[in-house]
Amino acid sequence: MAIMGVQMVVTLLVASIMQRVSPHYSFGRWLLCNGSLFRFKHPTEEELRTLAGKQKPKAKRERRTNGVTDEKPLTVPKDIDLRLDTQPITTIDALVLRYFLEYQWFIDFALYSTIIYLFTEAYYCVVDAQNEINIGVLWCLMSIIFSIKVLFTVMKHYFRSEEGGERSVCLTFAFFFLLIAMIVMVVRDEYLEFGLEPGLASVCHNLENFLAQRGWQWSMPFVKLAFKIALVALCAFLGGCLTFPGLRLAQTHLDALKMAADRPMLQLLLHMSFLPPVIVVVLWIRPITRDFLLNAPMGKESVELMSNSAYNTFRLWIIVVLCLLRFCLTRFHLQAYLCLADRWVEQMKREAGRISMLEIQRKISRIFCYLTVVALQYLAPIVLTFHCVLMLKSLGDYSWGLYPEPTGFTPVVDSSPVQSHSPTSEEEEDTEDVQAAVEQIMGAMSSLRGLFTPLFFRGLFSFLTWWVSVCQIVTSLFGLYFHQYLGAS
């Protein structure tokens, strides 16, 4: 409390509200159950028999009397005139969905972490709290970790599949992204302006001084190599986790465009929501964006359209707006997925042969049961990108451009020992113990701030934001090609 101050009070208050309010009102549950999404109900056996012109089967006792003992699955022709009934999704319906509780908790946590981050931004604007720990950053970091965890949980579901095709797809894309990450690591900052090398050099310099003051020695080239290997491994892991979200996004994008065939404005918004990863990737290609805006050719002269700091602010706002745009179109993508049931029935009608009633019911019900999986695949990359940008702004000492902010600074590692005074009484001894503990905690945090500089965080979170967009571009473009050409054939 003495260390965190007002931010700790607000954090505890928000955590308490989240625990008490979520069972009664949940933003994640509202996204699915606000009445805007409707599901297709599977037909009953009576309805299928009526459409097929069949009578109700005899009871078991009558079949035994007539000498019929084998029970064959009830089948109907595929070309029956089957029309599915629709029903708005309710909370009772959502409780049977797979991973519904994980989805609800994840969306609610992302919302509350964003609220706390906005509060800390306002708090830092009003109060000079540079020496306090930014609680909003910790919440954003947890949102990033939970986003990756959710994506990994969904990927594990594909690995448990009996067929094994999904597992091969994830491993193939993970290896492919591993190669791309290794290539990106050797690209110079003149082309991809992450700033990883300067940031890593500053960390190694501070770490070398920190260890030298304590009589330790460590090979700094080994630290750089280990960090790059770990980052490449993380890139491959993220690529594998984002494989099926990208493929699913391509499918729902195409289906949503077909649903909005008579709504050109909605089609324009859908196309705009599909392009954000491309725009994010281009924003970090220096010759195309920063160099052009800082030295725009105007005839024989070059004009500076914006400064370096203005471009950094502009880039942050562009990514935030693109994330919000994609989030606002969540309903259309989820409804496009739910309409797969009706589309599957229409495709079945064009086929010849017979199909069991149970298979029809199972296929239609399965599409609805995996709604929350599709929602997680759509929303988790948005949450991941959004909170990476928030971390980039706060830890990278950038500005939103809305209010004057203090310039960032790089703390110097202070290894001076804590001065101790001789106690004169038991009360003074207890007081000094508490003060010593607080000073040790503050010293440890100051050391960490001194090691990991804003320059390092700029490089790290710029790269992570850019890499998530690269994974989405590759997988979604492959998904478009697959669903338009390979899947259709």
From Swiss-Prot:
What is the disulfide pattern of this chain?
none
Keyword list (alphabetical) reads: Glycoprotein, Membrane, Signal, Transmembrane, Transmembrane helix
Q: Where is this region: Disordered?
A: 51-70, 413-432
Please list which residues make up the signal peptide: 1-23
**What exactly does this protein do?**
May play a role in protection against oxidative stress.
Membrane spanning segments where?
Answer: 99-119, 135-155, 167-187, 225-245, 265-285, 305-325, 367-387, 460-480
Q: Which InterPro entries match?
A: Transmembrane_161A/B
A cellular component term, taken from the record's GO annotations = membrane
Q: Which family does it belong to?
A: Belongs to the TMEM161 family.
User: Where does it primarily localize?
Assistant: membrane
Where is it localised? Membrane
Q: Which residues lie on this side of the membrane: Extracellular?
A: 24-98, 156-166, 246-264, 326-366, 481-489
Q: Which residues are glycosylated?
A: N34
State the species of origin: Xenopus tropicalis
Membrane topology of the entry: Multi-pass membrane protein
Protein name (Swiss-Prot/TrEMBL): Transmembrane protein 161A
Q: Which residues lie on this side of the membrane: Cytoplasmic?
A: 120-134, 188-224, 286-304, 388-459
